[in-house]
């Protein structure tokens, strides 16, 4: 396991977690992910911590309300999500994670358009 640090663009939201080194990331084609264009990964929640400046953390939900998609209200960056489908885990935007080059990772496609 490796400790990772992450943040939104303006730094108002910071988060850290432990995970295995990233070799791949996921691209989802659901209606939300296809619009935000992020590469994501599921990480264990045991050591996930976040800190946000007051009023900076926004949350978006829609449809069946199964997921909470968190973003920075200052810079607009999608940071991480929580879902009832994966309790105790977080879905992180790998573009926010320090030292992770998303262009160097293998891409796994998730057909959220049909499976969610």
What does each model-found stretch correspond to?
Residues 1-7, 12-116:
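A short Gly-Trp-Pro
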